[in-house]
Amino acid sequence: MVDTEIWLRLMSISSLYGDDMVRIAHWVAKQSHIDAVVLQQTGLTLRQAQRFLSFPRKSIESSLCWLEQPNHHLIPADSEFYPPQLLATTDYPGALFVEGELHALHSFQLAVVGSRAHSWYGERWGRLFCETLATRGVTITSGLARGIDGVAHKAALQVNGVSIAVLGNGLNTIHPRRHARLAASLLEQGGALVSEFPLDVPPLAYNFPRRNRIISGLSKGVLVVEAALRSGSLVTARCALEQGREVFALPGPIGNPGSEGPHWLIKQGAILVTEPEEILENLQFGLHWLPDAPENSFYSPDQQDVALPFPELLANVGDEVTPVDVVAERAGQPVPEVVTQLLELELAGWIAAVPGGYVRLRRACHVRRTNVFV
């Protein structure tokens, strides 16, 4: 039995991973005859041995055909191409299917996870964080799911960065289907698709906790953008803590269900971050970072000669959507006058018009010189 076939059969045993899989693969490769009795000598149960032997020949042949295609790889844990960051975890996958560039797996990665039903706030700040980090050389790793995962991947690609997607199913299909084009773009820009599951395995619910440990295991840290208290993103954060990774949490508006997860993590000791540089400072990895150009900064420069337009009005526009009539009522000004001032604030980059009203974009560094509440 050739080595590749041994790994394919072992990968079909869902309860097998890590050192045990590597040890068994090496042992089986030395045997001249394989049956259930022989396999049980390695420590496999009878059921696991039967699973190994019954893995369909058709699946093996289709997997071998898949591996013949360009940039399609099967990476055992004893391979020089296996990511060392993941290998250092206690429950690392015994082997990985990878489509794309193998060197991406060895890059400096930050996992970015969050809610599938994200808010406007989560999308905006998740995108800004990922764009900035990607331009600074960080590979953005996530799960290709709807919501924040997709936002993270797209943001990295938008600035010509590199992104890695770890799937909870086999690489023969992309889930969700709406992200097929996103997956293709990710590969075109030097990223990779990764899975520990046989190629034809569907996206079953119990696959995703296993997927989450790979997302965190590949990365130096995990950024949670938005998440409910009962969320797979918190599973990823827990995996990160167990693996000795840093966990970063982006705070959100009080009352937003998506803020509950990050706020809970912060209470448990996660690092609260309000700008990407705070992540870079916590994850120093030897690169010579280029300073941000002033025009790319999220916040206004703290200079006395920069005038803050209409501070009384700006104080009444928050991070959540605020209708125009509410702003006018709070400011005690006529609606037509408020509309004119809001337009000027929008042109200056302080707020943005969204369906239903306006939202704040930048923190006023002039808060010490005005009564603007930030």
Swiss-Prot record:
It comes from the Bacteria. One of its GO terms (biological process) is DNA-mediated transformation. It holds the Pfam family DprA_WH. Disruption phenotype: No visible effect on transformation or growth in the presence or absence of mitomycin C (in strain KA797), on plasmid conjugation (in strain PC4020), on nucleotide excision repair, survival of UV damage or DNA recombination. Belongs to the DprA/Smf family. Partially complements natural chromosomal DNA transformation defect of an H.influenzae dprA disruption mutant. May help load RecA onto ssDNA. This is Protein Smf. It comes from Escherichia coli (strain K12). The lineage of its organism: Bacteria, Pseudomonadati, Pseudomonadota, Gammaproteobacteria, Enterobacterales. The gene is smf.
